[in-house]
């Protein structure tokens, strides 16, 4: 199980690296899907089934819509692929930063965290992630609405930015 968790963590980092190297929106969506599937599988193996399902629906329902709009509005005739030198340079630099972070974290010895699941202990009969979802929708409804409006505003900002220099609000005067 430890090797499986290590493999999921490595695949999650590689998916994030695929999004961060950003060769083109065509290829960035592949990294996003890989990172979301592996991240939700990682949460599922820790026992957080409901949160994993909700995150999977949000990532694939919300983020892929933004990528579809970006791809349709910023179509490149010759997109950069994974093998281009600039994309490979980004990937190598991100991996170098990750290795430096792991080395510094090993020197500081901050990796003694352990793995904690969401199973309740003792007389409790409700899992902790289900009770957290109930608290989220009861006490946190105001912040939930603010976050929804923020995501809607972000969608409109991204659509306006990728619309083009000649038609959008950001253009040369």
Swiss-Prot record:
Subcellular locations according to the entry: Mitochondrion membrane
Catalytic activity: a ubiquinone + NADH + 5 H(+)(in) = a ubiquinol + NAD(+) + 4 H(+)(out)
TM region positions: 1-21, 27-47, 48-68, 87-107, 139-159
Gene3D superfamilies membership: NADH-ubiquinone/plastoquinone oxidoreductase chain 6, subunit NuoJ (1.20.120.1200)
GO terms, molecular function: NADH dehydrogenase (ubiquinone) activity
One of the Pfam families matching this protein, by short name: Oxidored_q3
The name this protein goes by in its record: NADH-ubiquinone oxidoreductase chain 6
Organism from which the protein derives: Synthliboramphus hypoleucus (Guadalupe murrelet)
Lineage of the organism: Eukaryota, Metazoa, Chordata, Craniata, Vertebrata
């Amino acid at each position: 199980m430890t090797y499986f968790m290590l493999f999921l963590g490595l695949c999650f980092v590689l998916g994030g690296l695929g999004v961060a190297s950003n060769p083109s929106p065509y290829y960035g969506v592949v990294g996003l899907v890989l990172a979301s599937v592996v991240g939700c599988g990682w949460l599922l193996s820790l026992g957080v089934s409901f949160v994993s399902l909700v995150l999977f629906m949000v990532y694939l329902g919300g983020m892929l819509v933004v990528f579809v709009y970006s791809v349709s509005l910023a179509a490149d005739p010759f997109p950069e692929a994974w093998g281009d030198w600039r994309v490979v340079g980004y990937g190598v630099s991100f991996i170098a930063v990750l290795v430096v972070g792991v080395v510094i974290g090993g020197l500081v010895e901050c990796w003694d965290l352990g793995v904690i699941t969401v199973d309740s202990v003792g007389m409790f009969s409700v899992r902790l992630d289900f009770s957290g979802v109930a608290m989220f929708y009861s006490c946190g409804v105001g912040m939930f609405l603010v976050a929804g409006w923020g995501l809607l505003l972000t969608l409109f900002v991204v659509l306006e930015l990728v619309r083009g220099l000649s038609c959008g609000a950001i253009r040369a005067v």
